[in-house]
Amino acid sequence: MNSGYPVSLQLTGKNITIIGGGKIATRKAQGLLNTGANITIVAPTCTPELAQMPITRIQSEYKPEHIQDAFLIFCCTNNQETNKQITKDAAPHQLINDCSAKERSNFYNMATIQKPDYLLAISTNGNDPTKTKAIREKIEQSTEF
């Protein structure tokens, strides 16, 4: 079994495209806001939180041209066929996370605890996001650094 290699990406100036406008897309965008990345949301509708964020919004169904210049792509729609098509349209050099199917992703997010002087990342290698979140919450409750 191949395991992932954890890294912390410097995203300043990088183009990130999130396809979808729901809760998962909102959570991904919130996590990216302070990275200096150029964030674009593509969705016919979006949550009120996404609508308030200082990001680019394209009110549209997904089209392949939406991901052409993206460094990172997040598939966050509630349509499996759309998510599958996005992963097929992605170029080999693009990093893509299909939030609905880990087998179509070439990276996964980690749960993080960030403080001014450290960043702690927790992962189940994309196998169990709920467990990852529970571990993070347990560490946050029991640790004072």
Region locations from a protein language model:
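Hydrophobic, well-ordered beta-alpha structural blocks that scaffold small-molecule cofactor pockets
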Residues: M1-T45, E49-M53, R57-E61
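Adenosine-phosphate binding glycine-rich loop
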Residues: Q10, I113-F145
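Short beta-strand and adjoining strand-loop segment in the mid-core
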Residues: T40, A70-N79, Y118-N127
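Short, ordered loop/turn segments at secondary-structure junctions
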Residues: P44-C46, Y62, A101-R104, N125
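Short amphipathic alpha-helix with an adjacent loop that forms part of the alpha/beta core around
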Residues: E61-D69
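Short glycine-rich, flexible loops that bind phosphorylated cofactors or substrates
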Residues: E65, E81-N83
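ADP-ribose/adenylate-binding Rossmann-like module
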Residues: L72-C76, N83-Y108
